[in-house]
A protein has these predicted regions:
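Short helix/strand-capping turn motifs
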Residues: 2-54
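Generic signature of intrinsically disordered, low-complexity segments enriched in small/polar residues
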Residues: 5, 23-26, 58-60, 81, ...
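Residue-identity detector for threonine
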Residues: 9, 21, 29, 39, ...
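Generic detector of well-ordered alpha-helical segments enriched in charged/polar residues
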Residues: 34-41, 45, 58, 62, ...
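Short glycine-rich, basic-tinged beta-strand/loop micro-motifs
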Residues: 48-68
Length: 112
């Protein structure tokens, strides 16, 4: 799963919502990286100090998934992804944010 983000406008969309094998923020061009503070809408998350990761709010991911998040299968997959992220140290201390790497290539943001 990945979030397509235009850092100039803040527009963002969740893609491949049922692929729980990867998580990333995909921006249009390499010129957009590293991300500057303030380029990610606060409703989506926050830019990590390195500008190459974004902590995306888990509740926002659920909201962006829309009706897919209502299914037991989606929730189980998301919970498993969160558990893996937790074991890997990729959650904020309060568990509200999931660390996503930033890339320009959607193929690196999926299990493909």
């Amino acid at each position: 799963m990945f979030i397509a983000l235009d850092p100039r406008t803040g527009e963002h969309h969740l893609r491949n919502a049922d692929d729980f094998t990867a998580f990333a923020v995909v921006v249009p061009t390499a010129d957009d990286l590293p991300l500057a503070p303030g380029t990610v809408p606060s409703s989506l998350g926050r830019v990590a100090p390195d500008g190459r990761h974004v902590f995306v709010w888990r509740d926002t991911v659920r909201a962006l998934a829309g009706t897919a998040a209502d299914s037991a299968a989606w929730q189980a997959g998301f919970d498993a992804m969160l558990a893996y992220a937790d074991r890997s140290g990729w959650l904020t201390p309060d568990g509200a944010g999931i660390r996503a790497h930033c890339t320009t290539d959607a193929t690196t943001a999926t299990g493909a």
